Structures are given as structure tokens and as C-alpha cells.
């Protein structure tokens, strides 16, 4: 199965999604960990991406594994009423009480990342299935998608 097919098999509802105000011209899927410096740096540029019509779809990839503190923090975001705001707060270093719901997709998304060859975060996958390991500035991602 290609990366594009693997991503298509994941319900968008199971991702934490930041959508453009206007037309969505393309999307990127990002395997993320709230405790990762470069994930935090990329997250601060989400508005630059959405302003260009790029939807950012986050998938959980706790670098320490599914039993780590990072996994608990990711679950806290995924289980929140306001997933976007909670994820943003956690990436900004805000300490929030752990909220771990039974049906969270953290383990499944971590396994998907491993199956796709993710070895670190952030790992960005374009809509065409191209894997871009590591942090890239928003402008570079816009150019990579041909939307500059």
C-alpha cells in the first residue's frame, strides 16, 4: 500500500485538523509530538500554511512510544472538546491535566507512522504521499506543494 493509500484509510475525524478560512487548495498530514521542539516550531507557522489554502492534518506520533508522557499529552489533545486549542496550548508548554479517553487513536496513529517509515517528528506527508522528514519552513512547504 502506498503512503497516499495509507493516509486515505485514516478518517480525517481522527486527526486534529487546522483548516483554511477560505478554499482548501491542498493538505499536509503531519506526524507530531507535543514535546518535540521542531513540531512546536512548525505549529507556530500553521497560520501561514492555512492562509495559503493548505489544511494541516495532525497525526499523533509520541516519540517515546504509546506509554510515554508524550503519548498522554497527545491523548489529552485528541480527547479534548477543543482539540485545536488544546494541542496549541500543549505545544506552547502549557501544563494541562491528562485527559485520556478510551477511544483515542494515539496507538493506531503511532503504528501507522511506524508502518510508513516515520523515525522522528515532525514527519510531513503531502497529499501525493511524499514524505518530508523533519521541520521545513512554511514557505518551503508552500513551494513544495506548488502553491506559492
Predicted features and spans:
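Thiol/selenol-based redox catalytic cores and closely related redox-interacting motifs
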Residues: 65-142
